[in-house]
Amino acid sequence: MLVHIPNVLTPEQVSMVRDRLDRAGDAWVDGRATAGYTGAPVKRNQQIAEHSPIARELGDVILAALERNPLFISAALPNQVYPPLFNRYEGGMTFGSHVDGAVRVLPNGVKLRTDVSVTLFLSAPDEYDGGELVIEDAYGVQQVKLPAGDMIVYPATSLHQVTPVTRGVRVASFFWVQSLVRSDAQRALLFDMDTAIQRLNASGADTDACRSLVGCYHNLLRIWSET
Protein backbone atom coordinates (compact mmCIF):
# COMPACT_ATOMS: atom_id res chain seq x y z
CA MET A 1 0.00 0.00 0.00
CA LEU A 2 1.44 3.33 -1.13
CA VAL A 3 -0.11 6.43 0.45
CA HIS A 4 0.69 10.01 -0.56
CA ILE A 5 0.33 12.34 2.42
CA PRO A 6 0.30 16.01 1.36
CA ASN A 7 1.38 19.05 3.39
CA VAL A 8 3.03 17.21 6.27
CA LEU A 9 5.22 20.28 6.71
CA THR A 10 4.09 23.82 5.97
CA PRO A 11 6.03 25.90 3.40
CA GLU A 12 7.53 27.84 6.32
CA GLN A 13 8.70 24.64 8.01
CA VAL A 14 10.17 23.32 4.75
CA SER A 15 12.06 26.60 4.28
CA MET A 16 13.42 26.47 7.84
CA VAL A 17 14.50 22.82 7.56
CA ARG A 18 16.16 23.41 4.17
CA ASP A 19 18.00 26.48 5.46
CA ARG A 20 19.38 24.51 8.42
CA LEU A 21 20.40 21.60 6.18
CA ASP A 22 21.98 23.85 3.56
CA ARG A 23 24.20 25.32 6.30
CA ALA A 24 24.96 21.98 7.99
CA GLY A 25 28.54 21.78 6.66
CA ASP A 26 30.51 18.90 8.20
CA ALA A 27 27.33 17.27 9.50
CA TRP A 28 26.91 15.82 5.99
CA VAL A 29 28.66 12.44 5.76
CA ASP A 30 28.86 9.51 3.35
CA GLY A 31 25.39 7.94 3.16
CA ARG A 32 26.81 4.43 3.24
CA ALA A 33 27.27 4.85 7.00
CA THR A 34 23.72 3.59 7.58
CA ALA A 35 23.44 1.15 4.66
CA GLY A 36 23.17 -2.58 5.19
CA TYR A 37 25.21 -5.33 3.55
CA THR A 38 23.28 -5.28 0.28
CA GLY A 39 22.55 -1.55 0.26
CA ALA A 40 26.08 -0.21 0.73
CA PRO A 41 27.45 -1.23 -2.70
CA VAL A 42 24.62 0.59 -4.54
CA LYS A 43 24.28 3.63 -2.27
CA ARG A 44 25.88 6.89 -3.35
CA ASN A 45 24.56 9.93 -1.53
CA GLN A 46 25.19 12.16 1.46
CA GLN A 47 23.46 12.01 4.80
CA ILE A 48 23.31 14.08 7.96
CA ALA A 49 25.20 12.24 10.70
CA GLU A 50 22.59 10.12 12.44
CA HIS A 51 23.03 11.26 16.04
CA SER A 52 24.10 14.85 15.36
CA PRO A 53 22.32 17.75 17.10
CA ILE A 54 20.87 19.03 13.82
CA ALA A 55 19.41 15.60 13.02
CA ARG A 56 17.69 15.50 16.41
CA GLU A 57 16.49 19.11 16.16
CA LEU A 58 14.96 18.78 12.69
CA GLY A 59 13.75 15.25 13.38
CA ASP A 60 11.71 16.58 16.30
CA VAL A 61 10.00 19.05 13.93
CA ILE A 62 8.93 16.16 11.71
CA LEU A 63 7.85 13.91 14.59
CA ALA A 64 5.66 16.71 15.98
CA ALA A 65 4.05 17.14 12.56
CA LEU A 66 3.37 13.41 12.31
CA GLU A 67 1.57 13.41 15.66
CA ARG A 68 -0.87 15.97 14.24
CA ASN A 69 -1.44 14.16 10.94
CA PRO A 70 -4.49 11.85 10.98
CA LEU A 71 -3.78 10.46 7.50
CA PHE A 72 -0.32 9.27 8.57
CA ILE A 73 -1.73 7.69 11.72
CA SER A 74 -4.49 5.96 9.75
CA ALA A 75 -2.11 4.63 7.08
CA ALA A 76 0.85 3.60 9.23
CA LEU A 77 -0.81 2.82 12.60
CA PRO A 78 2.50 3.73 14.25
CA ASN A 79 3.75 1.93 17.33
CA GLN A 80 7.31 3.29 17.20
CA VAL A 81 8.89 5.75 14.77
CA TYR A 82 12.61 5.74 14.03
CA PRO A 83 14.14 9.22 14.45
CA PRO A 84 14.03 10.90 11.02
CA LEU A 85 17.22 10.93 8.95
CA PHE A 86 18.15 13.33 6.14
CA ASN A 87 19.83 12.71 2.80
CA ARG A 88 21.03 14.66 -0.22
CA TYR A 89 21.61 13.66 -3.85
CA GLU A 90 23.42 15.76 -6.46
CA GLY A 91 25.86 15.37 -9.35
CA GLY A 92 24.74 11.91 -10.45
CA MET A 93 24.28 10.49 -6.95
CA THR A 94 21.89 7.55 -6.75
CA PHE A 95 20.75 4.65 -4.56
CA GLY A 96 20.34 1.44 -6.52
CA SER A 97 17.63 -1.15 -6.09
CA HIS A 98 17.44 -2.55 -2.55
CA VAL A 99 15.16 -3.60 0.29
CA ASP A 100 15.49 -1.84 3.65
CA GLY A 101 16.86 -3.82 6.56
CA ALA A 102 14.26 -5.54 8.71
CA VAL A 103 15.43 -4.17 12.07
CA ARG A 104 16.88 -0.85 13.22
CA VAL A 105 18.26 -0.09 16.68
CA LEU A 106 16.89 3.02 18.39
CA PRO A 107 19.24 5.37 20.27
CA ASN A 108 18.11 3.79 23.56
CA GLY A 109 19.11 0.32 22.33
CA VAL A 110 15.55 -0.90 21.69
CA LYS A 111 15.11 -2.76 18.41
CA LEU A 112 12.50 -1.48 15.94
CA ARG A 113 10.97 -3.69 13.24
CA THR A 114 10.75 -1.76 9.97
CA ASP A 115 7.20 -2.39 8.73
CA VAL A 116 6.73 0.91 6.90
CA SER A 117 9.22 3.08 5.00
CA VAL A 118 8.65 6.81 4.73
CA THR A 119 10.18 9.52 2.53
CA LEU A 120 9.39 13.20 3.16
CA PHE A 121 10.39 15.39 0.22
CA LEU A 122 12.19 18.64 1.08
CA SER A 123 13.03 19.75 -2.49
CA ALA A 124 10.45 20.91 -5.01
CA PRO A 125 10.25 18.76 -8.17
CA ASP A 126 11.52 21.59 -10.38
CA GLU A 127 14.69 21.96 -8.28
CA TYR A 128 16.24 18.80 -9.72
CA ASP A 129 16.13 16.33 -12.60
CA GLY A 130 16.07 12.61 -11.93
CA GLY A 131 15.89 11.57 -8.28
CA GLU A 132 12.59 9.70 -8.60
CA LEU A 133 11.81 7.24 -5.84
CA VAL A 134 10.97 4.06 -7.76
CA ILE A 135 8.99 1.49 -5.77
CA GLU A 136 8.14 -2.00 -6.97
CA ASP A 137 4.94 -3.35 -5.44
CA ALA A 138 2.25 -5.90 -6.22
CA TYR A 139 0.73 -3.54 -8.79
CA GLY A 140 3.94 -2.86 -10.72
CA VAL A 141 6.52 -0.08 -10.65
CA GLN A 142 5.56 3.27 -9.12
CA GLN A 143 7.65 6.43 -9.67
CA VAL A 144 7.31 9.03 -6.94
CA LYS A 145 8.41 12.67 -7.04
CA LEU A 146 6.36 14.85 -4.72
CA PRO A 147 6.13 18.54 -3.77
CA ALA A 148 8.30 19.73 -0.90
CA GLY A 149 6.54 19.01 2.38
CA ASP A 150 4.68 15.97 1.01
CA MET A 151 5.37 12.42 2.11
CA ILE A 152 5.07 8.89 0.69
CA VAL A 153 4.38 5.90 2.95
CA TYR A 154 5.01 2.39 1.59
CA PRO A 155 5.77 -1.16 2.81
CA ALA A 156 9.38 -1.60 3.93
CA THR A 157 9.35 -4.98 2.19
CA SER A 158 9.28 -3.20 -1.19
CA LEU A 159 12.20 -3.24 -3.61
CA HIS A 160 12.98 0.42 -4.29
CA GLN A 161 15.62 2.81 -5.59
CA VAL A 162 16.41 6.50 -6.14
CA THR A 163 17.35 7.29 -9.73
CA PRO A 164 20.45 9.41 -10.46
CA VAL A 165 20.07 13.15 -9.89
CA THR A 166 21.39 14.80 -13.06
CA ARG A 167 20.62 18.45 -12.21
CA GLY A 168 20.18 20.34 -8.98
CA VAL A 169 19.91 18.90 -5.49
CA ARG A 170 17.36 16.48 -4.05
CA VAL A 171 16.98 16.75 -0.26
CA ALA A 172 14.65 14.52 1.75
CA SER A 173 14.00 13.02 5.13
CA PHE A 174 13.51 9.29 5.50
CA PHE A 175 12.64 6.98 8.37
CA TRP A 176 10.82 3.82 9.33
CA VAL A 177 7.79 2.88 11.39
CA GLN A 178 7.09 -0.19 13.45
CA SER A 179 3.36 -0.46 13.01
CA LEU A 180 0.81 -1.82 15.44
CA VAL A 181 -0.11 -4.14 12.53
CA ARG A 182 2.88 -5.76 10.84
CA SER A 183 0.99 -7.13 7.79
CA ASP A 184 0.71 -4.68 4.90
CA ALA A 185 -2.46 -6.41 3.66
CA GLN A 186 -4.12 -6.01 7.06
CA ARG A 187 -3.00 -2.37 7.36
CA ALA A 188 -4.42 -1.69 3.88
CA LEU A 189 -7.78 -3.19 4.85
CA LEU A 190 -7.93 -1.14 8.05
CA PHE A 191 -6.94 2.01 6.15
CA ASP A 192 -9.70 1.45 3.58
CA MET A 193 -12.23 0.85 6.38
CA ASP A 194 -11.17 3.97 8.26
CA THR A 195 -11.37 6.07 5.10
CA ALA A 196 -14.85 4.73 4.30
CA ILE A 197 -16.07 5.35 7.86
CA GLN A 198 -14.89 8.96 7.74
CA ARG A 199 -16.65 9.52 4.41
CA LEU A 200 -19.87 7.98 5.69
CA ASN A 201 -19.79 10.13 8.81
CA ALA A 202 -19.19 13.25 6.72
CA SER A 203 -22.13 12.39 4.45
CA GLY A 204 -24.57 12.04 7.34
CA ALA A 205 -25.07 8.31 6.79
CA ASP A 206 -27.08 6.16 9.18
CA THR A 207 -25.56 6.58 12.65
CA ASP A 208 -26.18 3.01 13.79
CA ALA A 209 -24.56 1.59 10.65
CA CYS A 210 -21.52 3.83 11.09
CA ARG A 211 -21.24 2.84 14.73
CA SER A 212 -21.31 -0.82 13.74
CA LEU A 213 -18.52 -0.30 11.19
CA VAL A 214 -16.43 1.55 13.78
CA GLY A 215 -16.88 -1.43 16.08
CA CYS A 216 -15.73 -3.81 13.33
CA TYR A 217 -12.67 -1.64 12.69
CA HIS A 218 -11.60 -1.63 16.32
CA ASN A 219 -12.27 -5.33 16.77
CA LEU A 220 -10.05 -6.13 13.77
CA LEU A 221 -7.38 -3.79 15.12
CA ARG A 222 -7.65 -5.53 18.48
CA ILE A 223 -7.13 -8.93 16.83
CA TRP A 224 -4.22 -7.88 14.60
CA SER A 225 -2.33 -5.32 16.67
CA GLU A 226 0.91 -5.96 18.54
CA THR A 227 2.01 -3.60 21.30
Swiss-Prot record:
Binding site residues for 2-oxoglutarate: R170
Gene Ontology terms describing biological process: DNA damage response; intracellular iron ion homeostasis
SMART domains, per the entry: P4Hc
Residue ranges constituting the Fe2OG dioxygenase domain according to the UniProt record: 80-179
Gene3D superfamilies xref list: q2cbj1_9rhob like domain (2.60.120.620), Rabenosyn, Rab binding domain (4.10.860.20)
Molecular function via GO: 2-oxoglutarate-dependent dioxygenase activity; iron ion binding; L-ascorbic acid binding
Family annotation (SUPFAM superfamilies): Clavaminate synthase-like
Cofactor note as given: Binds 1 Fe(2+) ion per subunit.
Residues binding Fe cation, per UniProt: H98, D100, H160
Enzyme Commission number(s): 1.14.11.-
Keywords for this protein: Dioxygenase, Iron, Metal-binding, Oxidoreductase, Vitamin C
Pfam families listed in its UniProt record: 2OG-FeII_Oxy_3, PKHD_C
Cofactor: Fe(2+); L-ascorbate
Keyword Ribonucleoprotein in annotation: no
HAMAP family: Hydroxyl_YbiX
PANTHER family, alphabetized: PKHD-TYPE HYDROXYLASE YBIX (PTHR41536:SF1)
Protein name (Swiss-Prot/TrEMBL): PKHD-type hydroxylase Bamb_4479
UniProt source species: Burkholderia ambifaria (strain ATCC BAA-244 / DSM 16087 / CCUG 44356 / LMG 19182 / AMMD)
